Amino acid sequence: MARDNENILEEWCLIESNPCIFYDMLKRMGATEISVEDVYSLSYFDDYINNKEIINMNHILGVDTYLGENNKTLDKENNVVDVIELYKNNICMEDKYNKLLKHHSYIYGIIFLFNIGKHYKNNKYIEHNVPDNLFFAKQVIPNACATQAILSIVLNKDIELNDEIKNIKTFSLNFDSSMKGLTLSNCTFLRNIHNSYKPPIYLDKEDVHHDKKKSEDSFHFVSYISFQDKVYLLDGLQSGPVLINADEQNKPNPNNNNNNKDNDNDNNNNNNNNNNNNNNNNNNNNNNNNNNIGMNGKDWIEISREHIKKEIDEICNSQTNNDVRFNIIAVMKDKEYIIQEYINIHRIVKQRVNIKLINLGENIELSDEINEDEFPLLNDIPSIENLPNNVDTLYNIVNKSTLEINYLQSLLHEQKEIKKLWNKELTFKFFNFYPFIMSSLNLMAKHKLLKDAYQKEKLKNATKS
């Protein structure tokens, strides 16, 4: 949504912790396949922690039940779709897609907002070997933490971004964290995006309690990510990236010491098989696959969640801070994008089955045609030649694929409605209604309606009280 940035000041404004703002910010940074979700309870992450099994075409087409087990191994032949078993009756669509849409690898990072009080410790950073390509910037200007929290996630993941954003990382590659912070704060492109979320001010006279309220409400955004098999808290007020559970993460796992070589070979073989046979979603999963390995058996989301809970407990138990408001936002792959990929897979299956029926002499017309050349890894989807020759079986596949498409389209509609509501909320938050309000009041006064309206409202309020 375009907004007026002509009078943007050099300072950075305060930003509300709101999914509609972060989603819009990501889109303007070029992260078109990324979205955010509000986390109302730490149990929200349970499904994502449990669903680590790599998704393959058998899961999407209802041949195998997706169990979500991290340690489940698949032989190469098991990845080949059994066309006779397409869309099994015993697999619940709702349960299937609830798991497939909450896959572990879809979460890129977690943003935590909290009120900084006297409890805040700015010495959490303990010196360690920080990876050279880990992007961390110190916050050198007030109120920039919201944008820095987003950048701390997207610049450390394989996410497509605008050239302006990618150039920031390239330009500041050899800078220390303070210089990286200066680079961010002096980037006009970023500052204009950030400051466009400043609500319009309708009255010049500030509230008499403004300064007091401002001093009391000091909130801060930080990010949690996994990077090279480690979990990091990226907080711009710290001296460096904080390694979470550093002692635990650096402990050697005795179960792995004896068989590292064999395990590595097995993992490589499994990875090669999976890479050849998984669909496009799996490729995206593997791009972020520093998620659950090398942390002494603990999952990075689980480690982050435990650390956030510990932070919340410390703040709640602190007698110096009476404001215990928090907010958690998960930055993840956009469900709308994932659902559309699944819809396209089922549309291709349906189209191929219909072509097979035509080849067998059935009098049907192709509808909902899809250009298969636009989609990668089509070899994972059963070819026309490999489909069964039984007409009844083929019609059954068509009917079930239609049900899958209809169900997914209902999920897609829900996601689109969420985005519409966010867009509407953004409009109301940042549209300047002042000229409209003043024009309305002037017209009411001109036609001698203002005084009567005022008296009616005054009488109404007096009656209520």
UniProtKB/Swiss-Prot annotation:
The active site is at residues 145, 220. It catalyses: Thiol-dependent hydrolysis of ester, thioester, amide, peptide and isopeptide bonds formed by the C-terminal Gly of ubiquitin (a 76-residue protein attached to proteins as an intracellular targeting signal). Residues 11-333 form the UCH catalytic domain. The record marks 139 as: Transition state stabilizer. Changing residue 38 to E: No defect in parasite growth in host erythrocytes. Severe loss of deneddylating activity with no effect on deubiquitinating activity. One of its GO terms (cellular component) is cytoplasm. GO terms for biological process: protein deneddylation; protein deubiquitination; ubiquitin-dependent protein catabolic process. InterPro entries: Papain-like_cys_pep_sf, Peptidase_C12_UCH, Peptidase_C12_UCH_sf. The Asn-rich domain is dispensable for deubiquitinating and deneddylating activities. Thiol protease that recognizes and hydrolyzes a peptide bond at the C-terminal glycine of either ubiquitin or NEDD8. Belongs to the peptidase C12 family. This is Ubiquitin carboxyl-terminal hydrolase UCH54. It comes from Plasmodium falciparum (isolate 3D7). The gene is UCH54.
